[in-house]
């Protein structure tokens, strides 16, 4: 097939090793494609046509001016059209030659196609996909059945010219990624020399591939204009195909695929744990998020990689799909509808009547068969009339898209797929009028109910009963001696040890043994606690002294643990006076409170395991002693990974905080040393309660008739700063705390740093299940900060003025709820995923047995967004519904996003004015999935969620006498 002026047809290449041929020499360009070789002038090249017989480009009447400037994404990510434009205007001779070649192509293809189908259909249906006869005609059809890109199809005819092109323009030097190579090439059996030669050409041609990574590529203005001028879109859906891949996708390490659940800090020094994460849920969510938290969107995302339990931000990126402009897609529809439908009609005659149908699968990076389109069912856009013709390189070879083409016969379920595609085609043609929400004052910083009118603790709370231990509540202090302003006394008076699988294994336990050598060199089991005491009581004057002390009772990790961050902080960050204060005052005080553990924490601490509804209340002094031991890495059985005893629990020892050269580590250490200085200088006097809540019964969301509650939404302020007295949401990881002891530094990690008493929950809280949450009441804020993730900076010490309740707990209630991680944008709209997120939020907001008037408002924000891939508007609606079901008001912080603030307020006002209850709104979410997302072949739906809801409710109101009565049904 002629590719236009200046293109040299491909000639047959002899097979190496065949009779009469020899292997290429060192100067032969076949073995060294990077070297330049002499290329004949294209005008002198013999005319030879090799056209795939089934190519739609060969249909009579399809030839046109586009054939000579088809775009291909494989040539150094530079379009062929762009390259040809640099050659100057076409001459009359070149245009004549192009038209002649085009006519010959059409004739050749028509003859071959007519000869091919009557004789080969039966063989194609009975022979495996790759075992095709290698006749010239069938060899052309081989490209339909092998997993090659549309561009490779064209290279079979243009190999030499590709080499000429690259000879004139030096290659970028980018290696060919494995994911771009054809897995089938070289695997199918070959029976003649022609096939061997062709596959050698395939391999040679693939050397010119330039990898295209959808994640980090952004379209240029020129590309966008070129694509908008392509007559490749017959419908809005097809325009989505053209432009959907322009959306930038970011790789995420959620705090972790490698994690601090899987994400190891990039700068963490010589070692990487690279521990895979298990955020994967029973619903099949991605493993890389096992032990990380997630960031608040739209703030910066932590791009460092961590290892076992980091926060979500360290997953480098999140897939974000921007909304497409309806008007631009409609314009493209008008330009291409006639041509696309005419071509598709011709194609249907040739494919449907002959019984050989071809299906093209588009698979964008990060998706699993998300975009499949049938040739016979969808006559619009990129998926119509383009599947196998080389011209598709212009329409599908966008530099922002990574496409894997699977050419295969349609299976027995073709009728069902054709029905779906026809419905999809009809759906994209319909026009949904936009409901325009009322204009809101642009200068407004908040909208909705004034925050002063929202319920807050302790004013709205019920009177607490006397604090008493019970079967479901462990209290580690003397409740009879509890006095305001006094340090609580531990209970019992003397240390009680339990070394079992239901309680925390304490460093001071008699069962915590360590192998030691006696005077005769024999190894015996000694007390590890005694070794810890001996090591820590040594004087620290240099960071190396602290490192040596920690490794004395962690010998197994002497060659694994890295203390670079600690050494750099001590030597390079601290001033001399600060370093002196650290090793003369703060560290000795920390050692003292750590070694007092058996006198402070006298009662065994129960593990909060899955499926438990249990609370643990302990004093702030006890928590300080436990955290000091965590700093010195004294907790046994908590360093092993994989299938160890505590593998389903977060890390607690601080060894990962000391590793690497990340700029985050000094700021984390500053924040934590501020806490230790404060609690060692003056003993805290409060209590903290940790409650694991596991629910079995959830609302039937379709039938929930509870009305929406009040909403205050603002783009200013923070949850911890402006949500005092409210239920404050921690955008948690399943392993609570995420990467706080590693490299994570987003919403959850920051909260755990400024309220360090939260960190002790990692000691005894097992990974959260889908129906569970962790509620922490009474923690104190010790630090103030600025920035986020990489820009986080410890600012100053903070004096927490929160009121205390009758149990001497500060009225700061924090709930840790973990959102799902979505690698594909559309997945979050699946009903099962929506229901899971509703249940998780409902579990965190519900307080069984407490009247609604005694429940404080929920202070939350963009939960599950950012690197977890959640849509902020969907997540806001989910939290509003869950709060309504739990009968709580909502205070929503958009973290600087004023547009999101207005959108959420407008939607909430729209729904409440029309008196839509929780069940009706939930049904609208189901409708949105079924009508817009289920059969969507692009990364994101054509119509966004909120416009769909506006239109659905308004349409329902027009068809009933009572507006809103049937909305959502």
Curated annotation (Swiss-Prot):
GO cellular component term of the entry, any: nucleus
Chain ranges for the short sequence motif PIP-box (PCNA interacting peptide) as given in the UniProt record: 77-84
Catalytic activity entry: [(1''->2')-ADP-alpha-D-ribose](n) + H2O = [(1''->2')-ADP-alpha-D-ribose](n-1) + ADP-D-ribose
Gene Ontology molecular function: any one: poly(ADP-ribose) glycohydrolase activity
Record-listed E.C. numbers: 3.2.1.143
Recorded superkingdom: Eukaryota
GO biological-process terms attached to the record: ATP generation from poly-ADP-D-ribose; carbohydrate metabolic process; detection of bacterium; DNA damage response; regulation of DNA repair
Residue list for modification N6-acetyllysine: 334
Polar residues: compositionally biased ranges: 69-84, 101-113, 128-149, 179-189, 226-237, 275-284, 329-339, 369-387
Record-annotated active site: 730, 748, 749
Record-linked Pfam families: PARG_cat_C, PARG_cat_N
Motif (Nuclear localization signal): 10-16
Subunit-level organization: Interacts with PCNA. Interacts with NUDT5.
Record function comment: Poly(ADP-ribose) glycohydrolase that degrades poly(ADP-ribose) by hydrolyzing the ribose-ribose bonds present in poly(ADP-ribose). PARG acts both as an endo- and exoglycosidase, releasing poly(ADP-ribose) of different length as well as ADP-ribose monomers. It is however unable to cleave the ester bond between the terminal ADP-ribose and ADP-ribosylated residues, leaving proteins that are mono-ADP-ribosylated. Poly(ADP-ribose) is synthesized after DNA damage is only present transiently and is rapidly degraded by PARG.
The protein's name: Poly(ADP-ribose) glycohydrolase
Native source species: Mus musculus (Mouse)
């Amino acid at each position: 097939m002629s590719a236009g002026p200046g293109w040299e047809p491909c000639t047959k290449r002899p097979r190496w090793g065949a009779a009469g041929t020899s292997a290429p020499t060192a100067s032969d360009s076949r073995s060294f494609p990077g070297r330049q070789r002499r290329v004949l002038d294209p005008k002198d090249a013999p005319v030879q046509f090799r056209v795939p017989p089934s190519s739609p480009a060969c249909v009579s009447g399809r030839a046109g001016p586009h054939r000579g400037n088809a775009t291909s994404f494989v040539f150094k990510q530079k379009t062929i059209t762009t390259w040809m434009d640099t050659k100057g205007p076409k001459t009359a001779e070149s245009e004549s030659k192009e038209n002649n070649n085009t006519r010959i192509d059409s004739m050749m293809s028509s003859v071959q196609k007519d000869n091919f189908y009557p004789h080969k259909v039966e063989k194609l249906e009975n022979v495996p996909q790759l075992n095709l006869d290698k006749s010239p005609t069938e060899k052309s059809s081989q490209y339909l059945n092998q997993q090659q890109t549309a561009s490779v199809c064209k290279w079979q005819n243009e190999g030499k010219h590709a080499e000429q092109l690259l000879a004139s323009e030096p290659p970028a030097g980018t290696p060919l990624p494995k994911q771009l190579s054809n897995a089938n090439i070289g695997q199918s059996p070959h029976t003649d020399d022609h096939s061997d030669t062709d596959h050698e050409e395939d391999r040679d041609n693939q050397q010119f591939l330039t990898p295209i990574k959808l994640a980090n590529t952004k379209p240029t203005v020129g590309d966008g204009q070129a694509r908008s001028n392509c007559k490749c879109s017959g419908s809005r859906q097809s325009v989505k195909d053209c432009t959907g891949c322009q959306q930038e996708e970011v790789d995420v390490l959620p705090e972790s695929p490698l994690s601090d659940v899987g994400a190891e800090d990039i700068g963490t020094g010589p070692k990487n744990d690279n521990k895979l994460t298990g955020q994967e849920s029973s619903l099949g969510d991605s493993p890389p998020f096992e032990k990380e938290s997630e960031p608040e969107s739209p703030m910066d995302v932590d791009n460092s990689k961590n290892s076992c339990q980091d926060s979500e931000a360290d997953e480098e990126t999140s897939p974000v799909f921007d909304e497409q402009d309806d008007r631009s897609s409609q314009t493209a529809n008008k330009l291409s509808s006639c041509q696309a439908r005419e071509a598709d009609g011709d194609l249907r005659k040739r494919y449907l009547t002959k019984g050989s149908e071809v299906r093209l699968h588009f698979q964008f990076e990060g998706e699993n068969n998300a975009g499949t389109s049938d040739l016979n069912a969808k006559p619009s856009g990129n998926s119509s009339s383009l599947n196998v013709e080389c011209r598709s390189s212009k329409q599908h070879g966008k530099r922002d898209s990574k496409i894997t083409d699977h050419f295969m016969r349609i299976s027995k379920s073709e009728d069902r797929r054709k029905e779906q595609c026809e419905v999809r085609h009809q759906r994209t043609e319909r026009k949904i009028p936009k409901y325009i929400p009322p204009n809101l004052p642009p200068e407004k910083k908040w909208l909705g109910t004034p925050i002063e009118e929202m319920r807050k603790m302790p004013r709205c709370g019920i009177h607490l009963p006397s604090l008493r231990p019970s079967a479901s509540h462990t209290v580690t202090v003397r409740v009879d001696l509890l006095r305001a302003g006094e340090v609580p006394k531990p209970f019992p008076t003397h240390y009680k040890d339990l070394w079992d699988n239901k309680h925390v294994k304490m460093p001071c336990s008699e069962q915590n043994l360590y192998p030691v050598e006696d005077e005769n060199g024999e190894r015996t089991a000694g007390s590890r606690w005694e070794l810890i005491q001996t090591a820590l009581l040594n004087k620290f004057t240099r960071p190396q002294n602290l490192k040596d002390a920690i490794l004395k009772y962690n010998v197994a990790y002497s060659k694994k643990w890295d203390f670079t961050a600690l050494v750099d902080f001590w030597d390079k960050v601290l001033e001399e006076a600060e370093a002196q204060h650290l090793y003369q005052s703060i560290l000795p005080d920390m050692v003292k409170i750590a070694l007092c553990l058996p006198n402070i924490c006298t009662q065994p601490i129960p593990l909060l395991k899955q499926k438990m509804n249990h609370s643990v209340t302990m004093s702030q002094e006890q928590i300080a002693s436990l955290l000091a031991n965590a700093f010195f890495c004294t907790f046994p059985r908590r360093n092993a990974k994989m299938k160890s005893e505590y593998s389903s629990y977060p890390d607690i020892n601080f060894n990962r905080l000391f590793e690497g050269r990340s700029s985050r580590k000094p700021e984390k250490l500053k924040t934590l040393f501020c806490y230790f200085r404060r609690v060692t200088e003056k003993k805290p006097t409060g209590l903290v309660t940790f409650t694991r809540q596991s629910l079995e019964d959830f609302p039937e969301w379709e039938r929930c008739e509870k009305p929406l509650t009040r909403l205050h939404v603002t783009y200013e302020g923070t949850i911890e700063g402006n949500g005092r007295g409210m239920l404050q949401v921690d955008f948690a990881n399943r392993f609570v705390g995420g990467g706080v002891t590693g490299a994570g530094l987003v919403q959850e990690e920051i909260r755990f740093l400024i309220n360090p008493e939260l960190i002790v929950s990692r000691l005894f809280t097992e990974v959260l299940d889908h129906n569970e949450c962790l509620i922490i009441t009474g923690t104190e804020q010790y630090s103030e900060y600025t920035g986020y993730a990489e820009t986080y900076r410890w600012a100053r010490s903070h004096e927490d003025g929160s009121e205390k309740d009758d149990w001497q707990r500060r009225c700061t209630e924090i709930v840790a709820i973990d959102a799902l991680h979505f690698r594909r944008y559309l997945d979050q709209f699946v009903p099962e995923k929506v229901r899971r997120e509703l249940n998780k939020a409902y579990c965190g907001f519900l307080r069984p047995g407490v009247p609604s008037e005694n429940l404080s408002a929920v202070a939350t924000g963009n939960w599950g967004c950012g690197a977890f891939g959640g849509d902020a508007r969907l997540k806001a609606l989910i939290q509003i519904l869950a709060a309504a079901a739990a009968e709580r008001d909502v205070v929503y912080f958009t973290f600087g996003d004023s547009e999101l603030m207005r959108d959420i307020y407008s939607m909430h006002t729209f729904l409440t004015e029309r008196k839509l209850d929780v069940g009706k709104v939930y049904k609208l979410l189901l409708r949105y999935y079924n009508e817009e997302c289920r059969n969507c072949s692009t990364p994101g739906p054509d119509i966004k969620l909120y416009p769909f809801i506006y239109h659905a409710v308004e349409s329902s109101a027009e068809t009933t006498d009572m507006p809103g009565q049937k909305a959502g049904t």
